[in-house]
Amino acid sequence: MDIAKGSVVIAKAGRDKGKAFAVTEVLDSRTVLICDGKSRPIERPKRKNVIHLQATGTTVDCITTNRQLRIFLKNFS
């Protein structure tokens, strides 16, 4: 499954293992920026290797605030 901007992903490795995130930007073929609206707000995304992410097949459409993102991702955690 391909990871693109707006994809909902689950972290497979690291201290955030098992948490749901939304991809905010694809930097290159190996790294993306992810956020969850709480520990990683939209203003301060985390850089993550795509090898450590599992795609869920769901995409986020036009979420602009951290609160909206937290509510949307609550179903995945």
Ranges and model annotations:
Residues M1-K5, K12-A13, A22-S77:
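Ferredoxin-like alpha/beta domains used as RNA- or RNAP-binding modules
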Residues K17-K19:
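Short N-terminal binding/cap micro-motifs at the start of the first secondary-structure element
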